[in-house]
Amino acid sequence: MERVNDASCGPSGCYTYQVSRHSTEMLHNLNQQRKNGGRFCDVLLRVGDESFPAHRAVLAACSEYFESVFSAQLGDGGAADGGPADVGGAAAAPGGGAGGSRELEMHTISSKVFGDILDFAYTSRIVVRLESFPELMTAAKFLLMRSVIEICQEVIKQSNVQILVPPARADIMLFRPPGTSDLGFPLDMTNGAAMAANSNGIAGSMQPEEEAARATGAAIAGQASLPVLPGVDRLPMVAGPLSPQLLTSPFPNVASSAPPLTSKRGRGRPRKANLLDSMFGSPGGLREAGILPCGLCGKVFTDANRLRQHEAQHGVTSLQLGYIDLPPPRLGENGLPISEDPDGPRKRSRTRKQVACEICGKIFRDVYHLNRHKLSHSGEKPYSCPVCGLRFKRKDRMSYHVRSHDGSVGKPYICQSCGKGFSRPDHLNGHIKQVHTSERPHKCQTCNASFATRDRLRSHLACHEDKVPCQVCGKYLRAAYMADHLKKHSEGPSNFCSICNRGFSSASYLKVHVKTHHGVPLPQVSRHQEPILNGGAAFHCARTYGNKEGQKCSHQDLIESSDSYGDLSDASDLKTPEKQSANGSFSCDVAVPKNKMESDGEKKYPCPECGSFFRSKSYLNKHIQKVHVRALGGPLGDLGPALGSPFSPQQNMSLLESFGFQIVQSAFASSLVDPEVDQQPMGPEGK
């Protein structure tokens, strides 16, 4: 409370005091009356399933729309006598007293947005939610609440986030055009015109087409373009009922320029206005202002490229929806778009035609990517590696694979368990989860198979889809494997394992067999080459061992000590002849196949410990991890030889016989030979 000087006081003297908080306290008390059961409230606003009691004086003071509606009710006695009256979007219920109807039903505003606007009328505070921001702004323009309009303008200037149009619900009808079929009933967007029309006796004489056109014009007029909102001048106060044109369209210029919706157009007539035209007043109104909405779901973008990418997900373009892709407008110093010369030529950005896959319906931007995608359905792999023959569906992946042969593709991420290298850390993590861990959280619902990663499960699910039966044996296979399967019936096995003499129809199956059952990759046996019948000894003796006199090759020790070869008729076939070289060392004298010698020439990665050559770095890393690191113990120092093999040599042989001869030779040969070598200094010479 403060004292102010008042010149109107006479010479007798008077004092004038002003309470600055009086208006705030008055609004607070009125708000408490409204919330406490609607005490002393003289109007009930029904929005959807909710009711909002309020004071006419507060609504009329905040909203020029309510001021016009209540003024029309005061000037007409029809609603006061209890007769039914429909105010377009606001329906007056019977039972009103002197001063108009006590109930007003709002059809065009959701209860959530109207509650925020009503709270602002009593508290001068409003919560702006981005998901309902377009609806709030349109409702503020419709209700002619200038303060809320200025707040929305400020939000647009300061906010750069995407504004989402609210979803299609029964209680959100402000962003739906008249006659929308998904709601089940036509929407009346005039919101105040019909009551005044009924009061003047105009609505009864209008034809249905005129009523639809008037309702459409009012709906378009109440929803002008969103981003740039012009200042709203106060409506002139009238003592009597307002004219129907004034109540129907608060923005007469916009309403007169907007064409009415027509159900069917003939030749030469303008096209039917679509959803965005009815929402934003004129075709392309938002796009000219710098905001680009999607024509299907209503999502708003500020970048034309993002809008095109989003529309491609729907399978349509802006051109197909009836909108021309305009370049983003230039903004002036005040943040408003600069109007360009209307007489200048309008440029259309070239839009690519969207193409879709006929099988799965996926959308692609051109035919090249569509044809590349079709290979995933046919299983065709037209590109093959010139080095190893591995086939690929895409040329870029084949080129990347070819670089792995000459070492240009680095694999810095090494698995600590098996030594395999990877070019990316996520590939290493997927390898560890799938191979070296026992957790399988992702399960197949069809066959109950479990997998470590979701990608493995997704690849496995393809095995249960689109299987076709073989015409010969009736086995169900995917189309990608049917060609290889038919070779079994027509040609028979053409690729033979050089160790176990087992035949396979394709080289890829042979590679899997050799890696699974024999431990390391072996040279391919051509279609016209005789299979090796000596148990693969030629392959195992390809490398020269510098053993001293009296010693044998490691594979001979393993063969002679193994009971799995006792049933052979001639054990001499498994023994390899030896001859002494000039320096006194012994080496295996077994003929090496020609293709083996050729394959050795391709091995460019030598082992720094034993001098063995390998075809790739991954095989070299596996060899070092299995043979040298485990045998020597790595960082364990002198305890390495003791911990390299947890069992005795005899226990190792009996334990590992079931895993195959090659695993014994590659993984545990050094653990059986090195202890003898290490004991040489402990002989009579050392003692």
From Swiss-Prot:
InterPro entries: BTB/POZ_dom, HMGI/Y_DNA-bd_CS, SKP1/BTB/POZ_sf, Znf_C2H2_sf, Znf_C2H2_type. One of its GO terms (biological process) is regulation of DNA-templated transcription. GO terms for molecular function: chromatin binding; RNA polymerase II cis-regulatory region sequence-specific DNA binding; ubiquitin protein ligase binding; zinc ion binding. Residues 250-260 have a biased composition (Polar residues). It comes from the Eukaryota. Widely expressed at high levels during embryogenesis, especially in the central nervous system, especially to the actively proliferating neuroblasts in the periventricular neocortical neuroepithelium, in the telencephalic cortical plate and in the hippocampus. Also expressed in a stage-specific manner in the mouse germinal epithelium. While strongly expressed during brain development,m its expression turns down in adult brain. GO terms for cellular component: male germ cell nucleus; nucleoplasm; nucleus. Transcriptional regulator that plays a role in many biological processes such as embryogenesis, senescence, T-cell development or neurogenesis. Interacts with the TP53 protein to control genes that are important in proliferation and in the DNA-damage response. Mechanistically, the interaction inhibits the DNA binding and transcriptional activity of TP53/p53. Part of the transcriptional network modulating regulatory T-cell development and controls the generation of the regulatory T-cell pool under homeostatic conditions. Disruption phenotype: Mutant mice mostly die in utero or soon after birth likely because of developmental defects in the cardiac outflow tract and/or neural tube closure. Few mice that reach the adult life, equally distributed between males and females, show a dwarf phenotype likely due to defects in cell proliferation. Deletion gene also results in disruption of the testis cytoarchitecture and block of spermatogenesis. Homodimer. Interacts with RNF4. Interacts (via C-terminus) with TP53; this interaction inhibits TP53 ability to activate transcription. A zinc finger (C2H2-type) spans 292-314, 355-377, 383-405, 413-436, 442-464, 495-517, 605-628. It is found in: Nucleus. Residues 41-130 form the BTB domain. Residues 250-279, 332-351, 564-587 are annotated as: Disordered. Gene3D superfamilies: Classic Zinc Finger, Potassium Channel Kv1.1, Chain A. The keyword Repeat applies. This is POZ (BTB) and AT hook-containing zinc finger 1. Keywords: Metal-binding, Nucleus, Repeat, Zinc, Zinc-finger.
